[in-house]
From Swiss-Prot:
Similarity comment: family membership: Belongs to the SPMIP6 family.
Any one GO CC term of the record: mitochondrion
Organism from which the protein derives: Bos taurus (Bovine)
Coiled coil: none
GO BP: cell differentiation; spermatogenesis
InterPro entries membership: SPMIP6
Protein name: Sperm microtubule inner protein 6
This protein's UniProt keywords: Cell projection, Cilium, Cytoplasm, Cytoskeleton, Differentiation, Flagellum, Mitochondrion, Nucleus, Spermatogenesis
One Pfam family matching this protein: SMRP1
Localization (cell): Cytoplasm, Cytoskeleton; Nucleus; Cytoplasm; Mitochondrion
Length: 304
């Protein structure tokens, strides 16, 4: 039988053989364990730097190419009636389309490495045109017209009177260094205005070439002889071969340079090439006048 003290709650035995010295149960303060500094499982871990992984550029390009092919060929509209998968040939159909099918060679597809275009999805042709289904009726003419090639009207070779006057006035202003005159619009192809004679080109005495307008007879005001042939801007320069030797030194040849004539207001057209285009590669002094000008395509027309 044990008795407990109220203060210490120490068991006291009534028997001497079971006596035990009284001890206090007062708790002694100790440092808390290190569990407070351990990782807290209930706290969300923060962001950490991912390890730098090696990226193969070739594999990346291959993946990109495959993604582009999938997007291009499968289409973005699920209900589109023309999926390319519908037109790939299965081995049986490819065998029937094979020209050697009737020759008794059924293993031609398996042995021919160049025959994969019949069944491949991307780098291949699709089915033959005879295998393609008809266009849906609800598509209407809009689908048919979208697939037709555009036919452009032919370029007219001859110009009407209004266009003729525009081009001729431009040429006259370039040759005389004058501003463009005011053009009165006219509709339709009418006869040339009174006092204008048809021409097919003009000659430049400076360059010695004949300039023509392709596909038209343009009209220039004034007599034909004065409008067709430009006034000579520079006389023929004698060269070393054509000049006699100088008198003060025997056996020496030199070129005689004559000054430019001052009676013509326009600068030398030989070097004024702002409205000209040089052609012929290394060929000198060969120009084509815009628009639609071709040099040396017509013979030399004399005044009539």
């Amino acid at each position: 039988m044990f008795l407990f003290s109220r203060k210490t709650k120490t068991p006291i035995s009534t028997y001497s053989d079971s006596y035990r010295a009284p001890t206090s149960i007062k708790e002694v303060y100790k440092d808390p364990p290190l569990w407070a500094w351990e990782a807290n499982k209930f706290v969300t871990p923060g962001l950490t730097h991912t390890a730098q992984r090696h990226v193969d550029p070739d594999a990346l390009q291959k993946m990109l190419k495959c993604a582009v092919q999938d997007y291009s060929y499968k289409g973005s509209i699920p209900s589109h009636p023309y999926f390319p998968e519908k037109y790939w040939l299965c081995p049986e159909e490819a065998d029937r389309c094979n020209p050697n099918y009737l020759c008794g060679n059924p293993n031609y597809l398996c042995s021919n490495q160049y025959n994969t275009w019949r069944m491949g999805p991307y780098n291949c042709w699709n089915k033959c045109t005879t295998y393609l289904p008809r266009l849906p009726k609800e598509a209407g003419m809009e689908t048919v017209v979208r697939g037709m090639p555009l036919v452009y009207p032919p370029k007219p070779e001859r110009l009407n009177a209004y266009e003729r006057e525009v081009v001729v006035n431009m040429l006259n202003s370039l040759s005389r260094n004058q501003p463009l005159p005011q053009i009165t619009p006219r509709c339709g192809c009418v006869d040339p205005l009174p006092g204008r004679l048809p021409f097919q080109g003009y000659e430049s005495a400076c360059s010695g070439r004949h300039y023509c307008l392709r596909g038209m007879d343009y009209c220039v005001s004034g007599p034909p002889c004065t409008e067709r042939r430009l006034r000579p801007l520079c006389t023929e320069l004698p060269t070393v071969r054509s000049v006699s030797p100088c008198e003060h030194r025997s056996g020496m040849q030199c070129a005689v340079i004559t000054p430019q004539p001052s009676y013509y207001p326009c600068p030398n057209l030989r070097w004024d090439t702002s409205h000209f285009k040089k052609t012929g590669g290394s060929q000198r002094n060969n120009y084509v006048v815009h628009p639609e000008f071709v040099s040396e395509t017509y013979p030399d027309y004399h005044c009539w």
